[in-house]
């Protein structure tokens, strides 16, 4: 799909994100692009017999266009301040995506309440935490740029309270630090929420190296890394010759909080292997 065809500069090619009967398009704040996209879909409907429901088609303005006026009102599109894609609420202000965590935290606490008074061993409760509770958060971790320390402690407390029955456990076998160690190290394998969150976000390192160089988000991440390292000619292959410590040291210069934290944790990721 190509946008900005109504402008004099070269058009921009964008791939559509489609799943079943849902389709997401990302395009610039430009009336010509919106009309061009609508025209493509209308032409497709004449061939396939599938018609877009424009009354249910939502448009979210992001970035600098968040407060700009709506475009092409005659198309009947629904302009919104928030929309939901695959269970995640997206807003024009990235900071508001933290609301997704609050919603999932409520679901986690609901699971704990359902199992709280079951006659489970400590090992059984740990299994509930890992299989039913934390699995609610794995997708959210990929969306929320950064979780603050207060919320991490809140979730950790909820996990600990559930496992140890909110202090009603007659005997605590080991302290919390030891309990978080893996069983082979003498612990119980109780999840450390901070490390759990960092580990899931660390998966983006793998995605970064595997994604095509033409991928927009990779180009942006690479641009910020070049600036932080003061290496304007840096290539992807050059990263293997730069120590994780050096990258982590310069990560503080990256403006994007998501990538700043990931690159800052790079040495920890490598040491874990």
Predicted region positions:
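Active-site nucleotide-donor binding segment shared across nucleotidyl transfer reactions
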Residues: 1-18
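Conserved pre-motif C helix in the palm subdomain of viral-like polymerases
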Residues: 1-4, 33, 133
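Short, conserved micro-motifs composed of acidic
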Residues: 7, 52-83, 97
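Catalytic palm subdomain of template-directed nucleic-acid polymerases
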Residues: 14-46, 63-65, 92-96
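Mobile genetic element proteins and their domesticated derivatives, centered on retroelements
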Residues: 21-23, 44-45, 49, 59, ...
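Short amphipathic alpha-helical coiled-coil/interface segments
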Residues: 41, 152-163
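Basic, alpha-helical interaction scaffolds
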Residues: 74-147, 164-170, 200-215
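Extended C-terminal regions of large enzymes
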Residues: 155, 171-273
């Amino acid at each position: 799909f190509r946008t900005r065809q109504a402008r004099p500069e070269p058009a921009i090619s964008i791939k559509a994100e489609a799943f079943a009967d849902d389709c997401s398009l990302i395009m610039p704040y430009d009336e010509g692009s919106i009309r061009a996209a609508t025209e493509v879909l209308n032409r497709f409907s004449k061939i396939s017999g599938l018609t877009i429901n424009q009354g249910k088609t939502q448009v979210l303005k992001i970035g600098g266009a968040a407060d700009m006026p709506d475009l092409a009102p005659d198309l009947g599109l629904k302009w919104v301040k928030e929309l939901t894609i695959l269970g995640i609420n997206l807003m024009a202000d990235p900071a508001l995506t933290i609301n997704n965590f609050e919603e999932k935290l409520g679901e986690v606490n609901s699971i704990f309440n359902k199992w709280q008074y079951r006659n489970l061993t400590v090992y059984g409760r740990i299994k509930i935490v890992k299989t039913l509770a934390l699995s609610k958060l794995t997708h959210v971790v990929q969306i929320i740029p950064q979780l603050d320390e207060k919320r991490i402690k809140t979730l950790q407390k909820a996990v600990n309270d559930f496992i140890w029955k909110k202090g009603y456990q007659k005997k605590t076998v080991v302290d919390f630090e030891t309990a978080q160690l893996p069983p082979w190290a003498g612990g119980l394998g109780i999840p450390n929420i901070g490390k759990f969150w960092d580990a899931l976000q660390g998966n983006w390192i793998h995605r970064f190296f595997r994604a095509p160089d033409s991928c927009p988000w990779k180009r942006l991440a690479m641009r910020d890394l070049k600036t932080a390292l003061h290496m304007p000619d840096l290539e992807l292959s050059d990263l293997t010759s730069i120590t994780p410590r050096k990258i982590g040291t310069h990560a503080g210069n990256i403006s994007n909080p998501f990538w700043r934290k990931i690159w800052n944790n790079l040495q920890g990721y490598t040491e874990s292997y």
